[in-house]
Amino acid sequence: MLDLKFIRDNLELVRENIKNRGLKLELDLLISFDDERRKLITKIGELNALRNENANAMKDNIGDSSRHYLIEKGKALKAEIMDLEERLGYLTSRLLVEHKRIPNISAPDVPVGVSEDENVVLKVSGNIPKFDFKPKDHLEIGIHLDLFDFEKAREVSGNKFYYLKNEAVFLELAMINFAFSKLKAKGFDLFITPDVAREFIVDGIGFNPRGAESNIYKIEDTDKYLVGTAEITLGGYYYNTILDLKSPLKMAGLSHCFRKEAGAAGQFSKGLYRVHQFSKVEMFCFCRSEDSDRIHNEFLELEEEIFIELEIPYRVLNVCSSDLGAPAYKKYDIEAWMPGRGENGDYGEVTSTSNCTDYQSRRLKIRYKEDGQNKFVHMINGTAIASTRTLIAILENFQDAKGGVRIPKSLVKYTGFDYISPKN
């Protein structure tokens, strides 16, 4: 969350930022709650001082009538303080709810836009494949090659689930190993993370775990949720910790990701593109404030490097204000070319990386020492490999006229094969 003092000192900036993000929030309500809370704290302090004076007066050698008066006065002060403290508790709770709704300030170079259509293309890389046949989409390819089964998954688990089969199993594991090997060489600590997190961690990272807007699954009768990304569990790893940050602390975590994907439908969401469960290798970094922009750009470069080595055409987007998540100061998306997407092929999102500055660390109480003072760390996240969408891009870009699929050279040492042959 933003520092409350910063909000009060920069009301017009915060108000404009809320507007640019397409949100309707009652900033004045937040300020009114804070104003009343401050007055109550002052009033309670004054009443406690009077109560102490009253208690000290009772220690003197006084008559019965005076003592009775002081006793009654003490009771009245206690009752008034209790009433005000109850009001203070209510206000503090309401203040926190409104405070959490305020999004991070956007970076100066974030484009202002009302929808994802106003994301700005920064770069296009790779050659879009030219086929001398009509390319199939991944769903048709995968069923023909016996790589996945949606029908059986629908019977067993419901819509938007799938079984990976045969070579697709090796291909997913190969993508994960490829990403982990690269990140290990870049100095990341590697993790396989829990797939479950407590509500205060989910909330601290900035995911809304409750209500109709929630995109993650709650485990019934607990305070736990299935994670939508390892960003949640990696970000929570150092909850309530003061770090010794001599250099940026980089982590990479593999997790299953669970998403409700409520309302997602249409041809662009079919097959593996938008599902309830998938595997993902996530990058994460805790760093000093002066390092976060540099690390964010390094994460983008790493994501690009991965897709260059996978030989997949892609483009980089500077995500516009209304498409930013609340914690993000700035976000880049990479979209891979998918020949089977739409009528003539199109780009589809495969990675994102966000600099969340100290927005998450304030909630999670993750700090570092500098010049004898505790400061909130900056937190950066990014996708290394999201298995399902990367699999889509591989199947669709490397299909051939015979109905088979070539494996990218960078994955062959992990798969043990370089081609998926058509089934007879």
From Swiss-Prot:
E.C. numbers: 6.1.1.11
Binding-site list for L-serine: T229, A230, E231, E282, T383
Pathway: Aminoacyl-tRNA biosynthesis; selenocysteinyl-tRNA(Sec) biosynthesis; L-seryl-tRNA(Sec) from L-serine and tRNA(Sec): step 1/1
Location relative to the cell: Cytoplasm
Keyword Iron carried by entry: no
Binding-site residues for ATP, renumbered to this chain: R259, K260, E261, V275, E349, V350, T351, S352
Subunit annotation: Homodimer. The tRNA molecule binds across the dimer.
Domains as described in the record: Consists of two distinct domains, a catalytic core and a N-terminal extension that is involved in tRNA binding.
Function as written in the Swiss-Prot or TrEMBL entry: Catalyzes the attachment of serine to tRNA(Ser). Is also able to aminoacylate tRNA(Sec) with serine, to form the misacylated tRNA L-seryl-tRNA(Sec), which will be further converted into selenocysteinyl-tRNA(Sec).
Name used for this protein in its record: Serine--tRNA ligase
Species per Swiss-Prot/TrEMBL record: Borrelia recurrentis (strain A1)
